């Protein structure tokens, strides 16, 4: 299990939204590169980055901040938000990004995702953002009629590295992960699933380490880390102990 600390970028700054609302953004750090270094120093193994402006614009809008992050940390970085073409994917991977996250384009053009997986194996994840059980697109601003599992199953066997599932109704409000829908998705597909949206406390970490949740690749944490509700040392110690137990 991997705990992914999150950096959401708006106007070149690290922010957190409530319920995906760009008008409810709290600035946590004006220096994204420094935040990336801090997460690495705390012992995290990965970094999850979202270009919020890019998600709405349909193209990279915080490119300078992302490049600064890539230079500042040795940790692998996954990036979502505004990545819509094969050229975008290739450009980011060539700059040292480990994994791109395709969200809106996965709904609008699933064949592009499949082609991207062929061209860039192990470097493509699909972001499924859901509100009321339906997939949302364009930076969560538009709802579709597509179901979560229906979309995920389109990519079975394509080589998608992971599905990042975000429950928008819980994002940024520390309500706890939606375990029922997250585990239902993980049971429905063979693609590794990463939980996002609502992670609130060490209890969520402990829940993720229970046998029925170990099929998950990990979880993303934003506000709970920034607000100090989750102590990084304690969280990472729990995960380390669980890994040691599995390999014993």
From Swiss-Prot:
Keywords for this protein: Amino-acid biosynthesis, Cytoplasm, Histidine biosynthesis, Isomerase
Report the enzyme's class at the first EC level: isomerase
Identify a single GO molecular function assigned to this protein: 1-(5-phosphoribosyl)-5-[(5-phosphoribosylamino)methylideneamino]imidazole-4-carboxamide isomerase activity
Principal subcellular localization = cytoplasm
Pfam families for this protein: His_biosynth (PF00977)
State the GO CC annotations.
Answer: cytoplasm
- Reaction(s) the record says it catalyses: 1-(5-phospho-beta-D-ribosyl)-5-[(5-phospho-beta-D-ribosylamino)methylideneamino]imidazole-4-carboxamide = 5-[(5-phospho-1-deoxy-D-ribulos-1-ylimino)methylamino]-1-(5-phospho-beta-D-ribosyl)imidazole-4-carboxamide
Q: What is its EC number?
A: 5.3.1.16
Q: Which InterPro entries match?
A: Aldolase_TIM, His_biosynth, HisA_bact_arch, Isoase_HisA-like, Isoase_HisA-like_bact, Rhodanese-like_dom, RibuloseP-bd_barrel
GO biological process per UniProt: L-histidine biosynthetic process; L-tryptophan biosynthetic process
Q: Where in the cell is it found?
A: Cytoplasm
Q: NCBIfam families this protein is in? A: 1-(5-phosphoribosyl)-5-[(5-phosphoribosylamino)methylideneamino]imidazole-4-carboxamide isomerase, PRK13585.1
Family designation:
Belongs to the HisA/HisF family.
Tell me the HAMAP family matching this sequence.
HisA
Q: What is this protein called?
A: 1-(5-phosphoribosyl)-5-[(5-phosphoribosylamino)methylideneamino] imidazole-4-carboxamide isomerase
Species this chain originates from? Rhizobium johnstonii (strain DSM 114642 / LMG 32736 / 3841) (Rhizobium leguminosarum bv. viciae)
Highest lineage ranks of the organism? Answer: Bacteria, Pseudomonadati, Pseudomonadota, Alphaproteobacteria, Hyphomicrobiales
């Amino acid at each position: 299990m991997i705990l992914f600390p999150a950096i959401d970028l708006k106007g070149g700054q690290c922010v957190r939204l409530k319920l995906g609302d760009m008008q409810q953004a709290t600035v946590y750090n004006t220096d994204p590169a420094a935040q990336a270094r801090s997460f690495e120093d705390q012992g995290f193994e990965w970094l999850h980055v979202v270009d919020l402006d890019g998600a709405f614009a349909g193209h990279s809008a915080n490119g300078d901040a992302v490049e600064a992050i890539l230079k500042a940390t040795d940790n692998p970085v996954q990036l979502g938000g505004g990545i819509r073409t094969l050229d975008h994917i290739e450009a980011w991977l060539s700059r040292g990004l480990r994994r791109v996250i395709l969200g809106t384009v996965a709904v609008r053009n699933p064949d592009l995702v499949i082609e991207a997986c062929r061209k860039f194996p192990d470097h493509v994840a699909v972001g499924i953002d859901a509100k009321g059980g339906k997939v949302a697109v364009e930076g969560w601003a538009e709802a579709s009629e597509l179901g979560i599992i229906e979309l995920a199953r389109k990519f079975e066997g394509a080589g998608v590295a992971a599905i990042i599932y975000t429950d928008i109704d819980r994002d940024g409000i520390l309500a706890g992960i939606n375990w029922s829908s997250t585990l239902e998705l993980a049971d429905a597909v063979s693609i590794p699933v990463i939980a996002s949206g609502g992670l609130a406390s060490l209890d969520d970490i402990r829940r993720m380490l229970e046998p029925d949740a170990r099929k998950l690749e990990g979880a993303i944490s934003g506000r709970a880390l920034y607000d100090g509700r989750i102590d990084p040392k304690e969280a990472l110690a729990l995960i380390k102990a669980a890994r040691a137990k599995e390999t014993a």
